[in-house]
Amino acid sequence: MGKTLAEKIFSEHVGRDVKAGEIVLARVDIAMAQDGTGPLMINEFRELGFKEVKVPKAFLFIDHASPSPRKELSNSQKMMREFGKEMGVKVFDAGDGISHQILAEKYVKPGDLVAGADSHTCTAGGLGAFGTGMGSTDVAIIFGLGQNWFKVPETIKVVVNGKLQDGVYAKDIILEIARILGSDGATYKALEFHGSCIENMNVEDRLTISNMAVEVGAKAGLMPSDEKTREFLKKMGREEDFRELKADPDAVYETEIEIDATTLEPLVSLPHYVDNVRKVSEVEKEKIKIDQVFIGTCTNGRLQDLEIALKILEKHGKHPDVRLIVGPASRKVYMDALEKGIIKKFVELGAAVIPPGCGPCVGIHMGVLGDGERVLSTQNRNFKGRMGNPNAEIYLASPATAAATAVTGYITDPRRFI
Amino acid sequence: MVVKIKGKVFVFGDNVNTDEIIPARYLNTSDPQELAKYCMEDARPGFGRRDDIKGSIIVAGENFGCGSSREHAPVAIKAAGISCVIAKSFARIFFRNAINIGLPIVELKEADEFEEGDIAEVDLENGVVRNLTKGKEYRIRPYPEFLMKIMEAGGWLEYCLKEVGE
């Protein structure tokens, strides 16, 4: 019987053939924590008596509140840097960008097992790696032992066929998946993506979809590793990290869902749950006024996202009442955007361009909302209070919808601006 | 591990997420007692600072603990003195984190039959949950065998170290 991608990757990391449902000890290739979860992870690591870091690639990322807005957080970050020096663990610091983007650019290889103390570690699935989020204790154990126990997940096969119409993007596909599955529809399971739309999609878009696998409860969101993966790795200067990796044709899936990309419309997730998804064309009629638009994050803060948004804004201009915040996902994205003149244009358009990092998405700094205010963001999560104020509303959509909304001041279908 | 837990019930809904359990704006520290003060803050403001939550039981709906991987969420609940969380279902990362830090959690499909203020009793050893106020009794699915082994080994790290070898 054939294997799913999850079964293949776990079999390689356990050293024997494993099947969905088995609980296994598996070695981990890449482990990481960020400044929210890292301090607790380091405390646990020390409490458990570990003396050295045994996972092949271990990283610490200071991206959640970076540069630090408060002395308490500064002290935690200082502690992370000291730990990094002591243990020989590389620390990515203020200005470097978001963990998931940096991992995708520099380190993740198809077939890797990646464990991070951050729920969006599933982003690595975009490169055909099994990335999954865990707690601080679990990651401390991986730092110390190089392995951990996992349940090999059952897999939901997600088939996306057809070509997206203009103005509809990868973000709309994952919002459609959230609408279908609901916020716990894939709990304990992996998503595995198939179909012509996925095959024709670049890795940047695949990362957007995999990033939000956790929003339907999934443990991982796995893309095939194919020629598109090779192209991406080549662009990142590490083509040698490529290998083809696909599920077996006779793999066994728990369920299968199918999405017709050709009929998909721009979608928006309404407060306060990611699966509260509606068509932008319908919501537009309600003229929901938006105070702030945020284009960035590990979901949609890549170069092509900025380009898509800029194209619309350049042509139509920003509404004077909308605060526009733009956050490149990494130093590389920032540099590329600088070289292409994208940052200059955003600044001229009246945007606040913030340093690479999580920015306002985590609700600590750089764009906390006032009471009763509404934000439309390209991020992955719209829980009450997520962006720092439980009395604010968060709407989630693609960079194109975000840009169209920044043009008009209310939630707007981007198709008429393209 | 405490095998029999009894306490007053506080009822929460579906999809209680980690941003509600412990909002990021209070994550200035890893100190459990500090985190406890803001436990469930965005689901029920002031909850963590009430005098009557010590020893109580949180009862919730589907997908409890969804969202971020922050272990601070179960840590805050445990440090606030909550003795157990009963929910219709749990998000994966929260479930693992709770087991790892020793917060008893129980999946119970009939969780919505509890009302605020009911007295619940959880018998982990025999796999029974009782609503003492309403005089009802429910069988619960015991922890998976592997997790029971972890507990028998005296904790997850001990089990892992033993399995991995020196």
Curated annotation (Swiss-Prot), chain A:
[4Fe-4S] cluster binds at residues 298, 358, 361. One of its GO terms (biological process) is L-leucine biosynthetic process. InterPro entries: Acnase/IPM_dHydase_lsu_aba_1/3, Acoase/IPM_deHydtase_lsu_aba, Aconitase_4Fe-4S_BS, Aconitase_4Fe-4S_dom, HAcnase/IPMdehydase_lsu_prok, Homoacnase/IPMdehydase_lsu, IPM_dehydratase_rel_enz, IPMI_cat. Transmembrane segments: none annotated. Gene3D superfamilies: Aconitase, domain 3. The keyword NAD does not apply. Pathway: Amino-acid biosynthesis; L-leucine biosynthesis; L-leucine from 3-methyl-2-oxobutanoate: step 2/4. One of its GO terms (molecular function) is 4 iron, 4 sulfur cluster binding. It comes from the Bacteria. Keywords: 4Fe-4S, Amino-acid biosynthesis, Branched-chain amino acid biosynthesis, Iron, Iron-sulfur, Leucine biosynthesis, Lyase, Metal-binding. Signal peptide: none annotated. SUPFAM superfamilies: Aconitase iron-sulfur domain. Binds 1 [4Fe-4S] cluster per subunit. Its EC number is 4.2.1.33. Disulfide bonds: none annotated. Its cofactor is [4Fe-4S] cluster. It catalyses: (2R,3S)-3-isopropylmalate = (2S)-2-isopropylmalate. Catalyzes the isomerization between 2-isopropylmalate and 3-isopropylmalate, via the formation of 2-isopropylmaleate. Heterodimer of LeuC and LeuD. Belongs to the aconitase/IPM isomerase family. LeuC type 2 subfamily. This is 3-isopropylmalate dehydratase large subunit 1. It comes from Thermotoga maritima (strain ATCC 43589 / DSM 3109 / JCM 10099 / NBRC 100826 / MSB8).
Swiss-Prot record, chain B:
One of its GO terms (molecular function) is 3-isopropylmalate dehydratase activity. Pathway: Amino-acid biosynthesis; L-leucine biosynthesis; L-leucine from 3-methyl-2-oxobutanoate: step 2/4. Its EC number is 4.2.1.33. SUPFAM superfamilies: LeuD/IlvD-like. Pfam families: Aconitase_C (PF00694). GO terms for biological process: L-leucine biosynthetic process. It catalyses: (2R,3S)-3-isopropylmalate = (2S)-2-isopropylmalate. The keyword Transmembrane helix does not apply. Heterodimer of LeuC and LeuD. Belongs to the LeuD family. LeuD type 2 subfamily. NCBIfam families: leud, LEUD_arch. This is 3-isopropylmalate dehydratase small subunit 2. The gene is leuD2.
